[in-house]
């Protein structure tokens, strides 16, 4: 959630930044109005509580002195009723404030470019030149089917569209990538964690998926459990409602998991191959930091994922996302896009974000700063998306005869 006190004192800045995320000023007007109304209603409630306490004390004194307290009892009863009404009004305004604030995304960092969509993202770095061939390179689905690595037909038979079966060398390469990514990230100081794939609604609320993006989640019928869309959700929430000692920060973690997404709104996009799946694997980085550490840790996470791609010999570029392409919880995001010669374009393979204190406010993750409890900053990003890395290797390491060379660093993992 955004900081409502900052919204109050920096209203114009919030309007400008959130306009870049397609948030109308009228929503912020309503949010601020409700926030101010709630403060007034709380003052009224506190006034009734003070009157109740004072009159209750007065009643006790007069009763012990043997005085007539019938009129005072009537006043107390009237005030008690008014107090109950005021308390109910406060609860209604608190609920209204929550409903509005839960739908407002994070504000952007100052260096995030204003833009409408992915076409306005800015390339800030290119690593390795796009792979050149003396033959026309094939796309991954053609290579995968001809080699027997990717079985789209049986994936669809088992589960429907956007599911794939990996077989033989395809499955072995996928497993090798997971182990290599975990080892690479661990060597960079990220602690390996293993988490549940089913989480509660409160957990998803903490990282911002609920309530706004429920349509993209898979829910267990009749239970408060959802399949995770990314391991960012359970890993970040390991510290939900926790006060961390300052000397423990930063906390840096890596996690392998399967991920599950409905892909609502993606109809007609990437219908062939493995680019966009309902179930996919990812190795994630999650960091929890002090506010003054998060920029440095963001750079570490970007470097980790980029160096991992470089070690695999995969050409890629760093894209600074514009305001209109930023995620709900993100204040700043760098996408790493890998070159796919079969498609003849770059495709996202990692998205690394600093959410500042947005998720921490929702999940109540704090650290002890002297005598004060302060909100942490949380960061997350892929290092890397396993399926897309497999695709990138297939397309960049293909040979004219349709076979695929295995990158040197992966051979001992095969």
Swiss-Prot record:
Gene3D superfamilies: Bira Bifunctional Protein, Domain 2 (3.30.930.10), Serine-tRNA synthetase, tRNA binding domain (1.10.287.40). It is found in: Cytoplasm. One of its GO terms (biological process) is selenocysteine biosynthetic process. PROSITE patterns: AA_TRNA_LIGASE_II. GO terms for cellular component: cytoplasm. Pathway: Aminoacyl-tRNA biosynthesis; selenocysteinyl-tRNA(Sec) biosynthesis; L-seryl-tRNA(Sec) from L-serine and tRNA(Sec): step 1/1. Pfam families: Seryl_tRNA_N, tRNA-synt_2b. Keywords: Aminoacyl-tRNA synthetase, ATP-binding, Cytoplasm, Ligase, Nucleotide-binding, Protein biosynthesis. L-serine binds at residues 230-232, 284, 382. GO terms for molecular function: ATP binding; serine-tRNA ligase activity. It catalyses: tRNA(Ser) + L-serine + ATP = L-seryl-tRNA(Ser) + AMP + diphosphate + H(+); tRNA(Sec) + L-serine + ATP = L-seryl-tRNA(Sec) + AMP + diphosphate + H(+). Consists of two distinct domains, a catalytic core and a N-terminal extension that is involved in tRNA binding. The lineage of its organism: Bacteria, Pseudomonadati, Campylobacterota, Epsilonproteobacteria, Campylobacterales. Homodimer. The tRNA molecule binds across the dimer. This is Serine--tRNA ligase. InterPro entries: aa-tRNA-synt_IIb (IPR002314), aa-tRNA-synth_II (IPR006195), aa-tRNA-synth_II/BPL/LPL (IPR045864), Ser-tRNA-ligase_type_1 (IPR002317), Ser-tRNA-synth_1_N (IPR015866), SerRS_1_N_sf (IPR042103), SerRS_core (IPR033729), tRNA-bd_arm (IPR010978). Disulfide bonds: none annotated. It is an enzyme of class 6 (ligase). It comes from Campylobacter concisus (strain 13826).
């Amino acid at each position: 959630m955004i900081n409502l006190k900052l919204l109050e004192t920096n209203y114009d800045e919030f309007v400008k930044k959130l306009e870049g995320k397609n948030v109308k000023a009228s929503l912020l007007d309503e949010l601020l109005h409700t926030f101010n109304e709630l403060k007034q209603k709380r003052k009224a409630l506190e006034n009734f509580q003070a009157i109740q306490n004072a009159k209750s004390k007065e009643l006790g004194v007069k009763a012990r002195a043997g005085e007539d307290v019938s009129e005072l009892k009537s006043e107390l009863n009237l005030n008690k009723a008014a107090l109950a009404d005021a308390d109910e009004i406060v609860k209604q305004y608190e609920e209204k404030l929550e409903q509005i604030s839960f739908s407002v995304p994070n504000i952007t960092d100052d260096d995030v470019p204003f833009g409408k969509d992915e076409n306005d993202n800015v390339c800030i770095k290119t690593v390795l030149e796009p792979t050149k061939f003396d033959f026309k390179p094939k796309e991954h689905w053609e290579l995968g089917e001809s080699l027997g690595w990717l079985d789209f037909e049986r994936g669809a038979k088992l589960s429907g569209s956007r599911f794939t079966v990996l077989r033989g060398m395809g499955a072995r390469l996928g497993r090798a990538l997971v182990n290599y990514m975990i080892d690479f990230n661990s060597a960079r100081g990220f602690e390996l964690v293993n988490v549940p794939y089913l989480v509660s609604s409160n957990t998803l609320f903490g990282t911002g998926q609920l309530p706004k993006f429920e349509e993209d989640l898979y829910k267990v019928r009749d239970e408060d459990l959802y399949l995770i869309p990314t391991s960012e959700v359970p890993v970040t929430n390991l510290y939900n409602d926790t006060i961390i000692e300052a000397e423990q920060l930063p906390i840096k973690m890596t996690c392998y998991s399967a991920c599950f997404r409905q892909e609502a709104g993606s109809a007609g996009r990437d219908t062939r191959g493995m680019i966009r799946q309902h179930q996919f694997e990812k190795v994630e980085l999650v960091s929890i930091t002090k506010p003054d550490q998060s920029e440095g840790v963001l750079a570490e996470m970007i470097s980790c994922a980029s160096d991992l791609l470089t070690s695999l010999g995969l050409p890629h570029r760093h894209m600074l996302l514009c305001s209109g392409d930023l995620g709900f919880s993100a204040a700043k995001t760098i996408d790493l896009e890998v070159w796919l010669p079969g498609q003849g374009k770059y495709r996202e393979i990692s998205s690394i974000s600093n959410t500042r204190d947005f998720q921490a406010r929702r999940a109540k993750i704090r650290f002890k700063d002297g005598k004060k409890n302060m909100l942490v900053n949380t960061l997350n990003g892929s290092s890397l998306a396993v399926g897309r890395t497999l695709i990138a290797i297939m397309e960049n390491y293909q040979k004219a005869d349709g076979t695929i060379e295995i990158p040197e660093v992966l051979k001992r993992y095969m």
